[in-house]
């Protein structure tokens, strides 16, 4: 790993509730901080999960073209095609399946409140707009706790729900994917 003797490591925190695009500015500031501290003209980025999407979005952004300050980009566990569990949360404020087990009681209460208050969906989308950036960009199959990468509609002979038929689309990741040749 990195040590002071053989390299420079800087952790970059981001607000996971903010849209990916909003986190790019924070990443750029940290890159500038590292370049100023080390004298390097380029940095290596390693991003996990949504952090990988933030790093990728930066490298594919117009702002990056003028800077060209990333030598290598590595993403680990980043949902480049979206995340199946984001869809029920964004579409219906359903949180049970998306939370760790220790929060299931809270999620049950949340789901009860969501059924009683239609404004809860508006509130969720306002408080955590990043969920929209994580919506699936392909057909998904979700069998409860057994997520296989596809949304699944078991009411129609076990047919997949095509991404095109989902009420909400993820234009952000789709557009990012269209620019993948810039990587």
Question: For each of these PLM feature ranges, what is it?
Answer:
Residues 42-47, 76:
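Short beta-strand immediately N-terminal to the catalytic nucleophile in serine-hydrolase-like folds
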Residues 20, 54-55, 82-85:
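Extracytoplasmic/secreted cell-surface and envelope-processing proteins
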Residues 25-28, 56-60:
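Short, hydrophobic alpha-helix immediately C-terminal to the catalytic nucleophile
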């Amino acid at each position: 790993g990195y040590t002071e003797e053989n390299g420079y490591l800087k952790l970059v925190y981001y607000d996971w509730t903010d849209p990916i695009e909003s986190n790019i500015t924070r990443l750029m500031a940290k890159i500038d901080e590292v370049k100023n501290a080390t004298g390097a003209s380029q940095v290596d980025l390693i991003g996990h999960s949504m952090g990988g999407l933030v790093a990728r979005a930066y490298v594919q952004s117009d702002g990056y073209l003028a800077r060209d300050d990333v030598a290598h980009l590595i993403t680990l566990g980043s949902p480049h095609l979206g995340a199946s569990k984001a869809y029920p949360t964004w579409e219906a404020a359903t949180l049970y399946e998306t939370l760790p087990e220790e929060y299931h009681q809270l999620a049950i209460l949340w789901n009860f409140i969501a059924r009683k208050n239609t404004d809860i969906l508006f509130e969720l989308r306002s408080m955590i707009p990043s969920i929209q950036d994580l919506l699936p960009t392909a057909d998904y199959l979700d069998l409860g706790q057994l997520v296989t990468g596809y949304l699944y509609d078991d009411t129609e002979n076990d047919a997949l729900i095509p991404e095109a038929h989902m009420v909400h689309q993820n234009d952000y990741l789709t557009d990012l994917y269209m620019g993948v040749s810039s990587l």
